[in-house]
C-alpha cells in the first residue's frame, strides 16, 4: 500500500479481484512520519518524504472490494541524526534527483537538525510514526 498512490485504484481493485482467491483478504498499510508534531512536519518536507495523509483518511477502493476493518496506531523509531540523512536517501525524490539537489537537501537537513533544532551530531532522536492499515474484503 505504500505505493497505492502510484496506481489507478480502479484498475488495482480489478486486478486484486482477479488474483486473490475467493474468501481472501487484502491489507493496505501506510507507515508515515507522524506530522502532527510540527518539527516532524518540517522534517518530512525537508526530506521530501512523500504523501502526508490526514488523520482518519481512507484509501480509495472500488467494488467488489470494501474496507471491513481499520487499524490506526502510532509508534516510535529511534534514530541518530546521521540515520535521518540515510533515511532521506531512500526517498524517491532523492533517488531521482541529481547531485545539486541532493547537496541542497543534505545541507537543509543538516541546518535543520543541528542549527535550528540544536541536536548534537550522533544524538539519538525519537521519530514518531503513524500506521494506518485497512483490511479489504469482497
Where is each model-derived feature located?
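A short SAM/SAH-binding and catalytic strip from SAM-dependent methyltransferases
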Residues: 1-10
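Conserved catalytic/acceptor-binding region of the Class I
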Residues: 11-79
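Generic hydrophobic/packing signal
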Residues: 3, 24-27, 136
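Conserved Class I S-adenosyl-L-methionine
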Residues: 60-138
